[in-house]
């Protein structure tokens, strides 16, 4: 064995030996404890403060509120977080022993500087970690009780809430503050870490912003066996923070390959809402971006306001996409939208064959429409589904009466008035219990039962 290999083996062994397991239990822990199974810490934020690169944090069941109930956690070290343990750590069943981030509106004034519930940002004054292997598994995120919803507008009679409200507007009858409007998972655009990061067996529900918005520098991002339900704008996207060497517009330098590989597999992505309640833009289940090679397969992608998969961000030659073996259903405008210069093509699954080789698409095989809707019987909330399928948006204009508009009309100037909009529903809260029923709905496709 040569000296270089010996040195590398020694370094890896030293890293593995130094990595610690830290245990956290809201009910049984204390922040002065050692962080062992027998003497766990009480709070996730305390474990993150104590942790070092390479450590694994094990979370018992409970709703973790963040430091001073700020409802976000700064992750500035290359750690892993595993949830779903019983209170005594004797077993791990994530859907039975739920490790949750479920913020309350009462604490939205304490949200601090975190842009995401999990805000990943390494110290910019230090060299970013290389060769990381960060794993996040068995976590449940729900923003449904931190949001503010209109008391009456956009409220079908059989739903719990009215339409979602973007700040500064809020429901002054029931809430203290506006919606937090934060990401669920966010990593800073200046992130320069390399290596692997993964999210598995987790649920992302009721977010008023992009649920999964991860910037990565170089390496592999994996999102597997997760449920994305009732989020706003985009369910999941990965971005590359490394610059692309270019020899001209839409012309990467010869030999260039994407620095980030993203595998998005066996996830269920439903009810991604538009940016505004006019249902006009965004509302993408999944989006690929420049600098990323995406392998999107075996997912269930449906009921998104605009499209299931969006490929319009950035030039086609600066990203690559494999879109294979997915099940699409009832996305309102299209199953895929992509740039076919100079326009945007909106395509249903039965037209995918024409898209191979277009806009960075390497492969687009074996995708299909949902054949048996019965798989979702008892899995989808029927009231929410019915209202979603029948919802309409309308607007009416009432022009101001009087001499001003009379003179404007004579001179050919725009008339003044009031526009009133109406949307039957928009981002109303989805019951978390029903979202978790989506695990295991369809054998082999989408999120499977967590074992």
Descriptions of predicted regions:
Residues 14-16:
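N-terminal signal peptide c-region/cleavage motif recognized by signal peptidases
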Residues 45-48, 53-91:
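N-terminal extracellular ligand-recognition/capping segment immediately after the signal peptide
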Residues 31, 90-99, 104-108, 168, ...:
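Acidic, glycine- and Ser/Thr-rich low-complexity intrinsically disordered tracts
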Residues 83, 131-145, 162-170, 194-206, ...:
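Right-handed parallel beta-helix
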Residues 18-46, 63, 451:
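Right-handed parallel beta-helix/beta-solenoid
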Residues 68-70, 91, 105-106, 111-115, ...:
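Short glycine/acidic-rich loop motifs that flank beta-strands on beta-rich extracellular proteins
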Residues 20, 55, 71, 77-79, ...:
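The right-handed parallel beta-helix/beta-solenoid scaffold, focusing on the short coil/turn
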Residues 79-174:
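Right-handed parallel beta-helix/beta-spiral solenoid domain characteristic of secreted/periplasmic
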């Amino acid at each position: 064995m040569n000296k270089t290999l010996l040195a590398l083996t020694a370094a890896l062994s030293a890293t593995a030996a130094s990595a610690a397991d830290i245990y956290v239990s809201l009910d049984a822990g204390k922040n002065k404890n050692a962080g062992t199974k027998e003497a766990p810490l009480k709070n996730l934020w305390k474990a993150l403060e104590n942790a070092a690169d390479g450590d694994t944090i094990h979370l018992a069941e409970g709703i973790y509120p963040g430091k001073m109930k700020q409802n976000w956690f700064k992750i500035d070290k290359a750690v892993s977080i595993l949830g779903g343990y019983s209170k005594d750590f004797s077993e791990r069943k994530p859907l039975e022993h739920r490790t949750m981030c479920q913020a309350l509106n009462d604490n939205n004034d304490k949200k601090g500087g975190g842009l995401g519930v999990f805000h990943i940002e390494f110290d910019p004054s230090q060299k970013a970690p290389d060769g990381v292997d960060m794993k996040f598994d068995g976590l449940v995120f729900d923003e449904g009780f931190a949001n503010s919803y209109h008391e009456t507008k956009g409220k079908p009679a059989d739903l719990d809430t009215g339409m979602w409200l973007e700040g500064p507007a809020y429901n002054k009858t029931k809430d203290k503050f506006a919606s937090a409007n934060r990401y669920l998972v966010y990593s800073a655009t200046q992130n320069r870490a390399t290596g692997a990061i993964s999210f598995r067996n987790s649920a992302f529900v009721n977010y008023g912003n992009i649920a999964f918005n991860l910037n990565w520098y170089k390496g592999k991002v994996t999102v597997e066996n997760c449920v994305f339900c009732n989020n706003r704008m985009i369910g999941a996207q990965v971005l590359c923070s490394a610059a692309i060497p270019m020899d001209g517009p839409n012309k990467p330098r010869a030999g260039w390959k994407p620095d980030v590989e993203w595998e998005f597999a066996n996830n269920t992505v439903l009810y991604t809402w538009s940016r505004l309640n006019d249902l006009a833009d965004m509302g993408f289940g999944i989006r690929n971006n420049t600098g990323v090679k995406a392998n999107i397969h075996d997912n269930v992608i449906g009921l998104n306001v605009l499209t299931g998969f969006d490929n319009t961000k950035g030039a086609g030659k600066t990203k690559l996409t494999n879109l294979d073996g997915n099940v699409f259903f009832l996305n309102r405008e299209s199953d895929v939208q992509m740039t076919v210069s100079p326009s945007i093509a909106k395509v249903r699954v039965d037209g995918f064959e024409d898209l191979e080789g277009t806009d960075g698409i390497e492969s687009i095989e074996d995708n299909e429409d949902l054949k048996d809707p019965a798989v979702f019987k008892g899995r989808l909330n029927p009231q929410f589904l019915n209202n979603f399928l029948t919802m309409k948006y309308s607007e009416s204009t009432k022009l101001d009466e009087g001499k001003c508009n009379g003179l404007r009309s004579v001179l050919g100037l725009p008339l003044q008035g009031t526009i009133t909009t109406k949307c039957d529903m928009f981002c109303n809260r989805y019951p978390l219990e029903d979202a978790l029923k989506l695990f295991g709905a369809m054998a082999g496709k989408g999120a499977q039962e967590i074992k």
